[in-house]
Amino acid sequence: MARDAQKSPSFQQQRVIIPNKHGNKLVGILHESGTQEIVILCHGLRANKENFIMTNLAAVLENAGISSFRFDFTGNGESEGSFEFGSYWREAEDIRAVAQHFQETNRTVIAIVGHSKGANAALLYASKYHDIKTIVNLSGSPDLRIGLEYRFGKDFMERLRKEGFIELKAESAGPYTCFSTLNLLLFAFAEMS
């Protein structure tokens, strides 16, 4: 449905704030084409709505005459709350808040496009809620355990049992982030249940 450059409407970008179910404000940018249909764009780990992937996707959709909304998950970018590693279910609920906001304003969310961690959150959303038929997975992980081995090493479970915690060097969360047995297991396996 690409439109000719001559017929293409001028798009408006508008900052929109949407509360999630925990009362945190999710901040996003609406790329308005004037159509009822809209696509939700979800960023990856250590990124935000201003990431070049999100802005490029919004530009491509604009050129096709499709409205989109790119936003910061809780604890990322301008959105309220604290950053948490492995918070896929919380981010799926952020997507829910965004989807409901647009559905309540008589918009039709035609797709969710997620990159990396955002793709995993979008897939979890789709597994729980069945209201959006198109989910686009851009580099989401097919097996979250692979990510654990990559970040913590192949012996992470043995070290976790022995020491009770694992340290991860993470620039976005300070010099070191510690994971206890409980929060690492919740991260690793809650998504799979």
PLM feature segments, named:
Residues A2-G34:
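N-terminal cap/lid segment of alpha/beta-hydrolase-fold proteins
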Residues Q36-G44:
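Short beta-strand element of the alpha/beta-hydrolase
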Residues R46-A58, F73:
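The serine-hydrolase catalytic nucleophile loop
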Residues K49, N76-R107:
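Catalytic nucleophile-loop/oxyanion-hole region of alpha/beta-hydrolase
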Residues A58-E80:
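Conserved alpha/beta-hydrolase
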Residues T105-S116:
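Alpha/beta-hydrolase fold nucleophile elbow
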Residues N120, Y125, Y129-S193:
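The alpha/beta-hydrolase serine catalytic core
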